[in-house]
Amino acid sequence: MATAQMHRNKVNSVALPSRVATETQSLILVKRLLAVSVSCITYLRGLFPEYAYGTRYLDDICVKILREDKSCPGSTQLVKWMLGCYDALQKKYLRMVMLAIYTDPEDPQTVTECYQFKFKYTASGPVMDFVSNNSNSVSTCSDAKKTSILLIRKLYILMQNLGPLPNDVCLTMKLFYYDEVTPADYQPPGFKEGTCEGLMFEGEPMYLNVGEVATPFHVLKVKVTTEKERMENIEKSIFKKQASKQPQTDEEKPDLSINDDLAQDNNGDRKRDDIETLKVEDLNLTCQEDGNLQSDDSQNSALADSQEKTSQAAPPAFGRKTRSGRIFQKPDLELKNQKESARASKGNQQARKPEKRSQSFEITGSQEDPAVAKRRKFSEPRTPLN
């Protein structure tokens, strides 16, 4: 019985490399972190149905992993986007993956929430914030695995506390490159040449630094940008002010970072019913040492749209419930406006809510990064939403 349980735990786990002594091991770690992070985001933001995910365990964390499912073309397409990311990552071309959520299918350049995964490639050792006095390979490996798990914990905490997205949203992905090493004609599988000029943010953006993971060969940073309204019900203890390394002007707003101590203190909270009672299913989005994923490579098959329109259930009158189980109460003013709108004629329905202002969206947003004015190469999914 004990042997069967050990085998079950092994099969149902997402293993991070116990050692990160080679570039291959580092690549596996970064790929798996990207897969788990994207799965966490899309699951807790309600972008795909429950059956599009399998349940696995990362250390003591129960995580949902996106998988290919014929009955959910959107999840299948996102898995293929991830394959394209892996191709660029393995070639050391990829600078950043931007997973963007927008509300208007006719205006994908105006986003309401986005997630940035930034990559650096280091050959002479990592640029770490957690420097050990005894700098040896064992310490480095241990720190990389520890910070990887901490990054996922912090991402889960943030996703479980953000206010809900609008009922109908669309999803897209944009890839950015290191132009000095990327061939001009290179495009990952499933992507085409794109543009990010004129990117706008719907509403007032809030920039959140989730964290970073460094190995001797890669550095991965994760940043989230969401609308300020979705932050109103989040406890202040979750965040800490980001210390700026450069003077800020009056117009600049400091980024917020997820509190490391809070993520570590919540270790025991991972066994809550809303996580642990989920059904165990097959894991399809796994990163093998050769970087291959099992998938159908046909570019011309009917894979639905690259930009997948998603829907959430209609909200109850008392508020919105997210997939994490948290209920967000609607302000009295909003409830009043909804009642007035219900009485209004159909011609006046557009006046239901005041139009949100859009602001130009700063893609890089990191004060540590050099100027990127010359970086002009972008990729976007090959098949746009019609």
From Swiss-Prot:
Domain HORMA positions: 24-224
Assigned keywords, A-Z: Chromosome, Differentiation, Meiosis, Nucleus, Oogenesis, Spermatogenesis
GO biological process: meiotic cell cycle; meiotic DNA double-strand break formation; meiotic recombination checkpoint signaling; meiotic sister chromatid cohesion; oogenesis; regulation of homologous chromosome segregation; spermatogenesis; synaptonemal complex assembly
Ranges where the record places region Disordered: 237-274, 289-386
Gene Ontology annotations for the cellular component aspect, listed alphabetically: chromosome; nucleus
Keyword Transmembrane: no
Alphabetized PROSITE patterns for the sequence: HORMA
Sequence ranges of Basic and acidic residues compositional bias: 329-343
Annotated compartments: Nucleus; Chromosome
Cited SUPFAM superfamilies: The spindle assembly checkpoint protein mad2
Chief place where the protein resides: nucleus
Compositionally biased region (Polar residues): 289-313
Record-linked PANTHER family: HORMA DOMAIN-CONTAINING PROTEIN 1, MEIOSIS-SPECIFIC PROTEIN HOP1
Function: Plays a key role in meiotic progression by ensuring that sufficient numbers of processed DNA double-strand breaks (DSBs) are available for successful homology search, promoting synaptonemal-complex formation independently and playing key role in the male mid-pachytene checkpoint and the female meiotic prophase checkpoint.
Name of this chain's protein: HORMA domain-containing protein 1
Lineage: Eukaryota, Metazoa, Chordata, Craniata, Vertebrata
Gene that this polypeptide is encoded by: hormad1
